[in-house]
């Protein structure tokens, strides 16, 4: 049987052997934090390593998402220098709340594979799971940086929690010319009934903005012991909100390698959407990532 062709909408690479620094990954990998112990992924991860993990599938193109580097332009230039088709597109890091952010945006935009930027904005009242000390979406300086994305034709990869979806919706509506790509299935970390309703309602609201699309990825980060059945409602809930035309699958490797193999993850995706039409499946696994990341 021929391998399914996929475009991975979300993965990472890093070279820890040649001076590229990722403090979140390297400083204390044995700590049992939100993501679990990082020891097994605290090593260089290059295109060949990624393709070995993805060997059950034919990865025809891929999108590299910034991995919170200490030097964002150095990371993007390194990725560009790899020269291969993996990655095909790059989403770089930009701290939108800093005074010199426009220099960063201009430097990213000058590189041919760059399509957008990401700055993780997950804010949560629980200090064990928050990624930021305050809600950046409500910060005036951050919003001013976001407003510059149109000038450089850059999309924004939005990694946030359900409690921030109303804010992201308002921002997307204020800047309809900027494409927002929701990361990691909206990160449904809280599983009590009220929180699940907040996630469902937030996904529907975000989807009502035409310039917002979604990636189904990163579910292992919020449920380390995931199963096909446990992630099913989040996969189908995302597709129900955004439709098969505005949803795409991503691996989040090697981070989600902490919680399972690439093959297990994609087989779970295939099982969950087995009743979808071939056209719908191709959108989810391949065509939508090509469309929204312009590859």
Give the residues covered by each predicted segment.
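Conserved, mostly hydrophobic/aromatic
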Residues: 10, 62, 90, 117, ...
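Divalent metal-dependent hydrolysis catalytic cores, especially in the metallo-beta-lactamase
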Residues: 29-43, 48-70, 87-95, 115-122, ...
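Acidic-and-aromatic substrate-binding clefts and catalytic sites of carbohydrate-active enzymes
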Residues: 41, 68-74, 94-102, 160-166, ...
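Generic structural signal for well-ordered alpha-helices
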Residues: 47-51, 76-80, 101-106, 142-146, ...
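Active-site gating/metal-coordination segments in enzymes
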Residues: 70-163, 170, 215-222
